[in-house]
Amino acid sequence: RDFCLSRGLGDVYKRQGTHKAFVNSYDGPTILPMLEQILRRNWPYEPEAMTMASGAGDGLAHTMNAFVQPGDFVITEAPEYPLILDMIEAHGAMAFGVPMDGFGMLPDALDRALTMLESQRLAVPHGGHQVSMILLQPRAQNPTGASFSPQRIDALADVLLAHYPNGVGMPLIVEDDHSGDVANAYATSLAQRLPQHVVHIRSFSKSHGPDLRLAALSGPEDAVEAIIAQRRLGSGWVSRFLQEILYEMLADKEAFHTVTNARHIYATRQKTMHALLLRQSLDVHTGDGLNLWIPVRDEPAALRLLAEQGIRVAAGKPFLPSLRISADATGADAGAGAGVDAHASRGIRVTIAQQGAVNEQVAAALAQAAAVTPKTSTNHS
């Protein structure tokens, strides 16, 4: 995140202190009514219930506490943000990766993954491991920048309804909208088709400041109540003072323009990096948000080459679930991850949040890293 793009939010902090929030109360609502009202204005669907979490990770953790049991499968995108994979492992569950393209998880691959996991469950006496959750990033996916299209939402919903007619037995779908208002794509959700099976989480860390530690969470009433019950075992509720600060920011025109400007700048940096990479004959998907995924032939060699030039990127291996299905029906080994789609193969994550990361020199180095092999790396050195 480029903090220089958020300087205009400081005046909103200075004006804070109108004290609309509930003070010294253990019985107030878990989300301020005035905040919920303003959030619902641009939420991607009309949810039954809403609450607040202390960031997207906190919301994910409480949701997993409520719905994931040890031994369960949790279907994720591949590649997937490593912290999410770590959270799944910490709950004693198993991440199962499904490849994706520029519009998110591939419906055919999800279909095959559900078929495979269900057949394995039925093959075990008394039932084996169940799929309890499907984790998705609806826009500005980390690390690929992919965002759902309306067509992809319909296709994924159709696959799920084919496996779970009328929604009976359907895993909980959890959407992590981690980039929130700095994503250039419109907010969207599978809840537009499957409202009773989706928990949608929107973070405000990248848009309004990480120290707010705030994310809004929506879903069917019973799911939201189960998540609130998990939070009562710890912090109890999210500070209503912080909720009021977020409300003031969302209602403030200057803050709105600051966030909008940041969104446009990040989008411009994505487009600029795409053009610079094309000049280097490297055509990769550059989507939305702060990151892009560069497929590489040899990850260790690529990382060494970039480190020699002082360019920091994230190694791709931690983004890949150890269990994952191929992008096409020819990949029988679910653990190999050997799909035809680049997003499911070896790669590195590049962050374009800072202006200095977007220039000809970086693009040339990334193109070289994408093609490098151990042999060419040795020759280069």
Can you annotate each of these PLM segments?
Residues 2-13:
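Single conserved hydrophobic/aromatic residue that forms the stacking wall/gate
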Residues 10, 16-20, 30-381:
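PLP-dependent class I/II
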Residues 26-27:
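Short phosphate-coordinating micro-motif centered on Lys-Gly-acidic
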